[in-house]
């Protein structure tokens, strides 16, 4: 290479230029490699800040677009539902979007009615049309069925005993005994209570026990409104709900009913529950709760109803005894308390002027101030004389005193002008009678009389818990009553003794008179 350079001197500038170019080329990466550290860090921060700002803006934009998109989607769905629900005639969208819907209740009922009438015989068709005409002419709750004031007071006084079943006398196919024991016979009918189910509490509940049920008898237990065709079963017409013995549920129609629960037979207990706030009806069977059967029955007054199409016996418990359903027993879901809260009427007493009790009082006094004994039990000491008028003229009264006492005439033997307080004159005859005693003739004796036994009912000795009750009682026998002959003989002896005393008094008076006349001559 040296030889080449030396041999060609004209190529020296060209080689020098190439060397300078090569030197610049080799020095260029060195200048990039030694960039200062401060410049490098500032450049990286700018790049990172720019990338973070871009990501924040992108997140905000995405969030706004998603929210607006969700709102637009919800509004679009709402418009579609509103359009199909309120603009399609004859169809109602019931559940999912895209389902074609079902006919409303009236159209479905008309369709079921037309199909059922074709399958009915003449008697069933006649009974159904008769009940339909009754419901159309007597809509539910067309009569006032709210609890009146008198019924409310009866509930307060009697408690749950105020409810009772009222059978239709014109049908005469069921008999009610002891208010809640129902016996059905050979044709179809039902019976409702006289009072509706209250609405004050949270839940009301009642049970029915099947005492007697043949296999071919259909029983329907539930609630219904008044007026209701009593020649039909509950659940067959508006508004009524029932649980039948075949295990089906009946709600306002007799054509077809879905299977609701197990069948019930003789010995089973069927309960009916009502929630007034939500209008929900549910049933129980032998203490086990079944699912709800109806909702929204809040405005109607519902009456417990029991019906059957054949012979059977059903006993209803409104709360007068314990329930089989334990929850109803604990929470006291009966229609009313077992006993009433009002006190019974006040008892009649002697202080209230009770005529019934005054008639039996032994110490009754008459208005004239003396005792008037009952003529059926009146007797004297001898037992052979009847009571006469009083022997005493009574207390002295002034001439201006007005009294309603009986006036008794007393014969007087005093001479005119003598004082009323003079001594009683001596008897003038031998036939002196005692005042107040009427003597019978010996030839016509009165009938034998037996006095009643003495009673201590009105005395303190007759009571058993009084303070004056004697600790030891002695039975005293009444004295014997003499016969009529003994009484006549005793009266004759008393009359003869009185005559002897009178004759002695007369002799003594005459003797004193003779001695009194001769005394002046001796003086």
From Swiss-Prot:
<keyword id="KW-0813">Transport</keyword>
<feature type="topological domain" description="Cytoplasmic">
    <location>
        <begin position="1"/>
        <end position="59"/>
    </location>
</feature>
<keyword id="KW-0926">Vacuole</keyword>
<keyword id="KW-1133">Transmembrane helix</keyword>
<dbReference type="Pfam" id="PF00622">
    <property type="entry name" value="SPRY"/>
</dbReference>
<dbReference type="InterPro" id="IPR003877">
    <property type="entry name" value="SPRY_dom"/>
</dbReference>
<feature type="compositionally biased region" description="Basic and acidic residues">
    <location>
        <begin position="496"/>
        <end position="517"/>
    </location>
</feature>
<feature type="glycosylation site" description="N-linked (GlcNAc...) asparagine">
    <location>
        <position position="430"/>
    </location>
</feature>
<feature type="region of interest" description="Disordered">
    <location>
        <begin position="361"/>
        <end position="400"/>
    </location>
</feature>
<comment type="function">
    <text>Components of the endosome-vacuole trafficking pathway that regulates nutrient transport. May be involved in processes which determine whether plasma membrane proteins are degraded or routed to the plasma membrane.</text>
</comment>
<keyword id="KW-0735">Signal-anchor</keyword>
<keyword id="KW-0967">Endosome</keyword>
<comment type="similarity">
    <text>Belongs to the SSH4 family.</text>
</comment>
<keyword id="KW-0472">Membrane</keyword>
<dbReference type="GO" id="GO:0043328">
    <property type="term" value="P:protein transport to vacuole involved in ubiquitin-dependent protein catabolic process via the multivesicular body sorting pathway"/>
</dbReference>
<keyword id="KW-0653">Protein transport</keyword>
<dbReference type="InterPro" id="IPR001870">
    <property type="entry name" value="B30.2/SPRY"/>
</dbReference>
<dbReference type="InterPro" id="IPR050618">
    <property type="entry name" value="Ubq-SigPath_Reg"/>
</dbReference>
<dbReference type="GO" id="GO:0010008">
    <property type="term" value="C:endosome membrane"/>
</dbReference>
<dbReference type="InterPro" id="IPR013320">
    <property type="entry name" value="ConA-like_dom_sf"/>
</dbReference>
<feature type="domain" description="B30.2/SPRY">
    <location>
        <begin position="127"/>
        <end position="323"/>
    </location>
</feature>
<feature type="transmembrane region" description="Helical; Signal-anchor for type II membrane protein">
    <location>
        <begin position="60"/>
        <end position="80"/>
    </location>
</feature>
<dbReference type="GO" id="GO:0005774">
    <property type="term" value="C:vacuolar membrane"/>
</dbReference>
<feature type="topological domain" description="Lumenal">
    <location>
        <begin position="81"/>
        <end position="523"/>
    </location>
</feature>
<keyword id="KW-0325">Glycoprotein</keyword>
<dbReference type="InterPro" id="IPR035780">
    <property type="entry name" value="SPRY_Ssh4-like"/>
</dbReference>
<feature type="compositionally biased region" description="Polar residues">
    <location>
        <begin position="419"/>
        <end position="436"/>
    </location>
</feature>
<feature type="glycosylation site" description="N-linked (GlcNAc...) asparagine">
    <location>
        <position position="421"/>
    </location>
</feature>
<protein>
    <recommendedName>
        <fullName>Protein ssh4</fullName>
    </recommendedName>
</protein>
<keyword id="KW-0812">Transmembrane</keyword>
<feature type="region of interest" description="Disordered">
    <location>
        <begin position="412"/>
        <end position="523"/>
    </location>
</feature>
<feature type="glycosylation site" description="N-linked (GlcNAc...) asparagine">
    <location>
        <position position="492"/>
    </location>
</feature>
<dbReference type="InterPro" id="IPR043136">
    <property type="entry name" value="B30.2/SPRY_sf"/>
</dbReference>
């Amino acid at each position: 290479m040296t030889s080449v350079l030396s041999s060609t001197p004209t190529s020296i500038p060209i080689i020098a230029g190439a060397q300078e170019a090569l030197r610049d080329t080799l020095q260029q990466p060195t200048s990039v490699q030694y960039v200062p550290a401060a410049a490098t860090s500032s450049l990286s921060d700018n790049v990172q800040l720019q990338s973070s700002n871009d990501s924040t803006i992108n997140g905000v934009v995405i969030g706004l677009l998603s929210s607006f998109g969700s709102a637009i989607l919800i509004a679009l769905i709402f418009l579609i539902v509103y359009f199909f629900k309120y603009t399609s005639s004859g169809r109602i969208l019931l559940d999912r979007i895209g389902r074609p819907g079902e006919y409303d209740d009236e159209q479905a009922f008309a369709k079921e009615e037309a199909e059922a009438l074709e399958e009915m015989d003449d008697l069933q068709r006649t009974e159904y049309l008769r009940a339909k005409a009754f419901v159309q002419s007597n809509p539910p709750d067309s009569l006032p069925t709210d609890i009146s004031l008198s019924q409310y007071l009866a509930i307060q006084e009697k408690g749950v005993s105020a409810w009772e079943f009222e059978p239709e006398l014109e049908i005469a196919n069921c008999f009610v005994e002891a208010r809640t024991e129902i016996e059905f016979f050979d044709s179809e009918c039902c019976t409702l209570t006289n009072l509706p189910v209250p609405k004050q509490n949270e839940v009301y509940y009642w049970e029915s026990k099947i005492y007697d049920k043949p296999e071919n008898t259909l029983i329907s237990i539930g609630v219904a409104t008044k007026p209701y065709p009593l020649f039909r079963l509950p659940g067959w017409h508006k508004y009524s709900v029932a649980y039948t013995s075949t295990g089906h549920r009946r709600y306002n129609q007799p054509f077809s009913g879905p299977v609701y629960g197990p069948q019930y037979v003789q010995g089973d207990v069927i309960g009916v529950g009502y929630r007034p706030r939500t209008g929900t009806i549910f049933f129980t069977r032998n203490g086990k709760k079944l699912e709800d059967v109806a909702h929204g029955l809040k405005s109607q007054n519902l009456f417990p109803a029991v019906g059957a199409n054949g012979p059977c016996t059903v006993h209803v418990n409104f709360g007068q005894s314990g329930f089989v359903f334990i929850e109803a027993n604990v929470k006291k879901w009966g229609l009313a308390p077992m006993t009433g809260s009002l006190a019974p009427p006040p008892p009649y007493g002697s202080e209230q002027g009770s005529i019934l009790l005054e008639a039996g009082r032994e110490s009754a006094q008459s208005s004239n101030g003396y005792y008037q004994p009952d003529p059926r039990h009146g007797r004297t000491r001898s037992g052979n004389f009847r009571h006469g008028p009083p022997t005493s003229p009574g207390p002295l009264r002034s001439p201006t005193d007005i009294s309603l006492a009986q006036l008794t005439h007393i014969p007087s033997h005093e001479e005119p002008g003598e004082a009323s307080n003079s001594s009683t004159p001596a008897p003038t005859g031998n036939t002196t009678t005692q005042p107040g005693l009427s003597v019978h003739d010996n030839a016509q004796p009165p009938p034998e009389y037996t006095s009643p036994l003495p009673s201590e009912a009105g005395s303190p000795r007759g009571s058993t818990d009084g303070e004056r009750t004697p600790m030891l009682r002695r039975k005293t026998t009444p004295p014997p009553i003499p016969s009529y002959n003994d009484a006549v003989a005793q009266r004759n002896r008393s009359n003869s003794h009185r005559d002897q005393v009178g004759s002695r008094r007369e002799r003594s008076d005459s003797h004193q008179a003779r001695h009194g006349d001769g005394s002046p001559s001796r003086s």
